[in-house]
Structure formats: structure tokens, C-alpha cells
């Protein structure tokens, strides 16, 4: 490949992966001290190590993104944005899961319930997105800032 930077579509996929895994890593690290079962603790250790490695590998591509810079800190005042991002990821995953479940549904009453729940998940996603967008926590139309936020979240998660 002779391009000077990553393709836009792969940059956006990197954004999705880094954002999702950064939130996941924080949650894993916050939960770990509360686990009492040794086998589960071992699984959490493996998951934490794997996600840390994933993030380290993925953020190496950020300098090749069409835009974006590094910043190793995440200020306490942006935790609202972090928590909103977690909710946004949950809502997005819910939309995907409901859509898949509907394609597997044969019973009309089950389909109707799932469609209503899908619509609720879509609404939650929209409300959460708009909350974040209005606060400038999700700069959807500014790729450089979007990637900057991803890096800040990843570095924060790795520093815990």
C-alpha cells in the first residue's frame, strides 16, 4: 500500500474498536478488585491483558489516520462524557442485538415485543448521542477531535 494515510472507513472502524475497548478496559479494571472467585479473577486478568495489548496495537495506527494526535491524559471533568460513551455503546450494541434477534423470530407476538424494544434502544441511542454531541463529548463531524478523544480514553484506560 502506497497511501500516505489510512483509509477513512478503516479509521472509523479503528475509532469504534478503540472507543469500545477503552470503556471495556476501564470497567474490567474497576470490577477486578471486587471479584472473589479465583478462576474468574484469572479470566479477568487474561481479559485485561488482552484488551491492553489490543489497545496498544490499535493506537499505533492513529498517527497514520487522516487526522488525530496523542494526549496521555483524561481530566476528571470529562468522566460524564466517558459514562455517556459507555451508555452510547450499550445502546448501539442493543440495537444490533435486537435487529439480529428479530431476524430469528418466528412468533408474531415475540417479534412485536422485540420491535418495540428495538425502537426503545434506537431512541436511547439517539438521546445519548445528542446529549454527548451537545456537550461536545462526541464530535461526530470532526474526525480529528473524535480520534483525539479515542486516544485520551485509551491512554486513561491503559494508565489505570
Please place each PLM-identified region on the residue numbering.
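Charged, compositionally biased N-terminal leader segments and the immediate start
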Residues: 1-3
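Alpha-helical bundle segments that constitute or directly flank the non-heme di-iron/ferroxidase center
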Residues: 5-34, 80-105
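Alpha-helical scaffold segments that form or flank carboxylate-/histidine-based iron centers
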Residues: 6-14, 38-53, 79-83, 109-122
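Generic structural signal for well-ordered, non-transmembrane alpha-helical segments
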Residues: 18-22, 45-52, 56, 88-92, ...
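Conserved alpha-helical segments that form or flank metal/cofactor-binding pockets of metalloenzymes
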Residues: 38-71, 125-135
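Carboxylate-rich helix-loop segments that flank metal/cofactor sites and access channels
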Residues: 53-96, 140-160
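Preference for long, well-ordered alpha-helical segments
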Residues: 97-160
Amino acid at each position: 500500500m502506497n497511501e500516505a494515510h489510512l483509509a477513512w472507513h478503516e479509521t472509523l472502524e479503528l475509532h469504534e474498536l478503540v472507543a469500545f475497548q477503552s470503556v471495556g478496559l476501564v470497567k474490567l479494571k474497576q470490577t477486578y478488585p471486587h471479584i472473589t472467585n479465583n478462576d474468574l479473577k484469572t479470566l479477568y486478568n487474561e481479559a485485561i491483558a488482552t484488551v491492553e495489548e489490543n489497545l496498544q496495537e490499535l493506537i499505533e495506527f492513529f498517527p497514520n489516520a487522516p487526522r488525530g494526535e496523542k494526549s496521555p491524559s483524561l481530566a476528571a471533568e470529562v468522566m460524564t462524557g466517558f459514562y455517556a460513551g459507555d451508555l452510547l455503546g450499550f445502546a448501539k450494541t442493543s440495537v444490533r442485538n435486537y435487529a439480529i434477534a428479530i431476524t430469528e423470530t418466528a412468533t408474531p407476538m415475540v417479534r412485536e415485543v422485540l420491535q418495540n424494544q428495538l425502537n426503545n434502544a434506537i431512541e436511547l441511542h439517539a438521546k445519548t448521542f445528542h446529549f454527548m454531541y451537545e456537550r461536545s463529548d462526541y464530535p461526530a463531524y470532526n474526525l480529528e477531535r473524535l480520534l483525539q478523544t479515542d486516544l485520551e480514553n485509551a491512554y486513561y484506560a491503559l494508565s489505570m
